[in-house]
Amino acid sequence: MNTTTIMIIVAVVIVWAVAFTVMLSLTKKRDAGEQKFIEENRDKALLHLYCKQIKVDGNSLANLSFTTGKNLQTIVALSGGQHTIEGVFETTESIGAKTRNIKTENMSFDVSLDAGHSYSAAMYFYSAEERSSYYKGEVGKAIVEVPLSFSVGSDFVKAHIIVYQEN
């Protein structure tokens, strides 16, 4: 190897090491922020939302107490009771070499939350019953399930927006 090749390899390794360190630091900071948020709001209902363009009871995130979780979900602290959740949900599934990407329009649904509990809301390709069977009951309690069906090309696609109360 000549010196130019060695210099390029060294430069790439240095850039990779710096980027890796920065990303590791950001991940640790986000994890610490999430844990602090959860601790500060343990007396509220914590809703982990895996969607975009979120509104709760007609209010945008700017008017709500929220943080970003380690999986880039939005965690919102809410009082117990009935709430209306709005958002654009997305999910992806890989079947062999084929990838299905599904995105909803703005969806709205009502959910009743209890203070002191944690919940997650996301879109899945399988119903709560199918997921519970597949994961041998190792999923939370489904408190809301909104079945969706789409016609994408010649494929018939079904999906579900499910809100789970976490174990």
Regions found by a protein language model. Give the residues of each.
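A short tyrosine-centered beta-strand micro-motif
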Residues: G81-E86
